[in-house]
Amino acid sequence: YGDIGGITAVVQSVYKLLNRFQQDLRGLIILLRVKIMLGDRNKAVATAEQIWEIGGSLDDVFEEAYIDSLLDLGLLEMASVLLKPRFENLAAALPFFYPVMLKFTIIGGSIKFMEKLTSSPHAPRREDMLFDFIDVYRLMNYGEHFKNIQRLILDNAKSALCGYGYQLYNDRGFTDLELVLYLDDETARGSMLKSELEVKINAYCASAGVKRANTLSVVVRSAAAHPARVTAERQ
């Protein structure tokens, strides 16, 4: 997202490469990231699926970028196939793949795997705020509800999703998890989706007979409002 002024040049260079080598995975992954940066979900998904069909091995840098792109598009099942061997060998995976692995567990709502990652001696950093979030949800016996709510959010946002981020805050004395969903720039349904999610999350909690946790919130924005894009466009 960081260099909007250079996107056109990047696209032209990538297309020249792909004209010569139509199945060049690295070029296609760069093109995929560009489509996501531009908020062009349909073309991004098509490119992600093209890469999937070609298959083959990738350097860690490009595999990580591809997995992150799949997560930004809400293609969790595809990402899970690539991450499964990483979860089976944390010692080798975490030094490089930790950010996308953690993002995957948060999107999927897996308290179990969030804890497995953050408590691993191979984790590259301490996650004190996330430890607190996990502990609270365990004490509340809220793990399964968290997973169901995350699935509900993804199911309702996926058709327009072009970015999935999160922030952790502890300014209230405990950890809040804020999910940030970036929608395809062609959609103008951000506020509508936000309202739909609030209604459906409340309905789920009511039907499950649980109080809604006030430590999880959702923000919906246009892909054009991604902070890196906004910063770059002002420069």
Go through the PLM ranges and name each one.
Residues 173-175, 184-196, 200, 219-232:
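C-terminal modules of long, charged coiled-coil scaffolds in eukaryotic assembly complexes
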Residues 149-153, 189-212:
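Short, non-transmembrane amphipathic alpha-helical segments
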Residues 128-158, 163:
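Helical scaffold of the NTase/Pol beta-like nucleotidyltransferase catalytic core
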Residues 124, 157-178:
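Short edge beta-strands and adjacent turn/loop segments
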Residues 1-20, 135-148, 185, 191, ...:
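N-terminal alpha-helical interaction modules that lie
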Residues 164, 203-234:
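A short amphipathic beta-strand at an alpha->beta junction
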Residues 180-182:
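Short hydrophobic/aromatic beta-strand micro-patches
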Residues 1-121:
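Alpha-helical protein-protein interaction scaffolds
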